Swiss-Prot record:
Highest taxon above the source species: Bacteria
Family matches, as HAMAP family: Phe_tRNA_synth_alpha1
EC annotation from Swiss-Prot or TrEMBL: 6.1.1.20
Name listed for the protein in its UniProt record: Phenylalanine--tRNA ligase alpha subunit
Organism from which the protein derives: Streptococcus agalactiae serotype III (strain NEM316)
Cofactor: Mg(2+)
Presence of keyword ATP-binding: yes
Catalytic activity, as annotated: tRNA(Phe) + L-phenylalanine + ATP = L-phenylalanyl-tRNA(Phe) + AMP + diphosphate + H(+)
Gene designation: pheS
Molecular function terms from GO: ATP binding; catalytic activity, acting on a protein; magnesium ion binding; phenylalanine-tRNA ligase activity; transferase activity; tRNA binding
Taxonomic placement: Bacteria, Bacillati, Bacillota, Bacilli, Lactobacillales
Length: 346
């Protein structure tokens, strides 16, 4: 067959094959390129026939070979773009999103139940004219114990198993150190001190359903002239009604705390049975919610406050206990495990 005719047929047949290739023929395109333009391809084989041509015809056919090579090389490059574009389009179509479909419902986050409880309690006290004061979680032994009428040899220190960092530095066991620091700075000539100190505290307890090595407290303090036990009871009565319902009553039972004298445990009438007796109040009609008392004169004197002129009351409650009572939670560990099945309930 005439070499020029073979070149023309190779060009035409290759162009026709290229037109048939789409995005699914990436490998076939590469194979055809090697078959036609490769070192052992069809065009190379035809090129070998140049040696058999006459001197006059060889340049003419050689030029035609180069033209065919250029045409086919360009054709392969263009078809490669077409194949790749078709491949991308097919992928886009397979992964396309139907914009008419309803969107997925977004799950919104919300405040943790302990945060909700803390903010609600803080709002109650802010409405009563108290200030909210924060403090250090890593505290000095002096402020945590000695300023609370607990010297180093006091037996009541055994009531609070403590995380010590050094002999004088510890993780606070209550937020009372905030009260001591605030009393040091308060100017009583401008009026009484009314404050609460919410925050996280730490004790060396074994974690179980009712105990945790860390928990949250809100402690309150009022110091001024002529502050009495009646003021304490009235304040606690109002707090209990706002937290547990307007019909709640409270009772005070004698107790002991080193930093208050006298000291009391405070119970609230059961909000589930109304005081008749149920499983929540253990058939007593009352639920213990906090400890309180009149500030010990020694605590006032250590802040440079004249205990003959000024008196005060203090109280402390656990946020976890309040939340557990209000929402019927029976395991304190649920607050800290990060299980959304628990937190989403609130």
């Amino acid at each position: 067959m005439d070499l020029q005719k073979q070149l023309e047929e190779l060009k035409i047949s290759t162009q026709e094959k290229l037109k048939e290739m789409t995005g699914n023929h990436t490998k076939e395109l590469q194979d055809l390129r090697v078959q036609v333009l490769g070192k052992k391809g069809s065009l190379t084989e035809l090129l070998k026939g140049l040696k058999d041509l006459s001197n006059d015809l060889r340049p003419v056919v050689g030029k035609q070979v180069n033209e065919v090579r250029d045409i086919l090389t360009k054709a392969f490059e263009e078809q490669a773009k077409v194949v790749e574009a078709a491949k991308i389009q097919a992928q886009l179509e397979s992964e396309s999103v139907d914009v008419t479909l309803p969107g997925r419902q977004m799950t919104l986050g919300h405040r943790h139940v302990l945060t909700q409880t803390s903010e609600e309690i803080e709002d109650i006290f802010l409405g009563m004219g108290f200030q909210v004061v924060g403090g250090f979680e890593v505290e000095k032994d002096y402020y945590n114990f000695e300023r609370m009428n607990l010297p180093k040899d006091h037996p009541a220190r055994d009531m609070q198993d403590t995380f010590y960092i050094t002999e004088e530095i510890l993780l606070r066991t209550h937020t009372s150190p905030v009260q001591a620091r605030t009393m040091d700075q308060h100017d009583f000539s401008k009026g009484p001190l009314k404050m609460i100190s919410p925050g996280r505290v730490f004790r060396r307890d074994t974690d179980d359903a009712t105990h945790s090595h860390q928990f949250h407290q809100i402690e309150g303090l009022v110091v001024g002239e002529n502050i009495s036990m009646g003021d304490l009871k009235g304040t606690l009565q109002l707090i209990s009604q706002k937290m547990f319902g307007a019909e709640r009553k409270i009772r005070l039972r004698p107790s002991y705390f080193p930093f208050t004298e006298p000291s009391v445990e405070v119970d609230v009438s059961c909000f589930k049975c109304g005081g008749k007796g149920c499983n929540v109040c253990k058939q007593t009609g009352w639920i213990e919610i906090l400890g309180a008392g009149m500030v010990h004169p020694s605590v006032l004197e250590m802040s440079g406050i004249d205990s003959e002129k000024y008196s005060g009351f203090a109280f402390g409650l656990g946020q976890e206990r309040i939340a557990m009572l209000r929402y019927g939670i029976n395991d304190i560990r649920g607050f800290y495990q990060g299980d959304v099945r628990f937190t989403d309930q609130f």
